[in-house]
């Protein structure tokens, strides 16, 4: 399996910030997307605020923000990303449009995972290019502290991509729970 080094996080609210913090704690290159540049400052503050807990949990000495970039362009965010964690609001219309865009700009072998807690993956990914690589990756909150993530495949999700997602989540100290669709 190709190692996943570059993670794109789409949406920088509570869940998105949690994924960003967890990935930074595991030395991943993280590209974050949100349409509002004003949110960058509050995100950086949240990363710094939570870092003492993360430092203890993962035995990290320092916070390296060199691995972190914030974009207001989804195309820039997705460039060369190996894993995409989408964290937008729970809304079918919004997520379906977003997944169509992500599918169009992500590299063909990039894993696409939605943090959705109650929407059906097949419906979310209805307009996504290469839906065999798409699934739900719903975390427990706060993501940077609680290590559980539910992985839910869509009808077109391949076992190969599910296994890659599982290994990635394990590489960032998550305990994947494989849910049948």
Language-model regions, residue ranges each:
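Amphipathic alpha-helical segments at domain termini/boundaries
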Residues: 25, 62-83, 164-173, 179-180
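Rossmann-like NAD(P)(H) cofactor-binding subdomain of soluble oxidoreductases
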Residues: 83, 88-148
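Conserved N-terminal Rossmann-fold NAD(P) cofactor-binding segment
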Residues: 29-81, 91-93, 97
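Structural signal for hydrophobic packing residues in well-ordered secondary-structure cores
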Residues: 47-55, 85, 106, 128, ...
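Acidic/polar active-site rim loop that often engages polyanionic ligands
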Residues: 26-28, 79, 142-152
